C-alpha cells in the first residue's frame, strides 16, 4: 500500500474525512510510514492512526511538518 498526501493544517484545525480530525480520539496502530512533504520534499516518518467516525474505522498517517503544522496522508490501493 502507498500513502498519499491528503491535506495539512494548523494544530487543532484540520478537516479529514469531512470532519475536524482533532475532535476525535486517535488510536495508535503501532505502525510508522515514510512520507514526503509535498511542498519542500523533505522526508518524514509519521505514525499511523485510526479513529472511529460515525461508526466507521478510518486510518491515516499524521505528523508535524513543522511546529503545530500537521500533515495527513491516506492509504491508497495500488
Predicted region positions:
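Acidic, low-complexity, intrinsically disordered interaction modules
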Residues: 16-77
Amino acid at each position: 500500500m502507498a500513502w498519499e498526501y491528503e491535506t495539512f493544517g494548523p494544530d487543532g484545525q484540520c478537516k479529514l474525512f469531512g470532519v475536524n480530525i482533532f475532535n476525535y480520539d486517535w488510536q495508535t496502530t503501532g505502525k510508522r510510514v515514510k512520507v514526503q512533504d509535498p511542498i519542500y520534499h523533505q522526508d518524514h516518518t509519521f505514525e499511523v492512526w485510526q479513529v472511529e467516525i460515525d461508526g466507521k474505522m478510518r486510518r491515516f498517517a499524521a505528523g508535524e511538518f513543522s511546529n503545530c503544522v500537521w500533515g495527513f496522508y491516506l492509504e491508497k490501493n495500488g
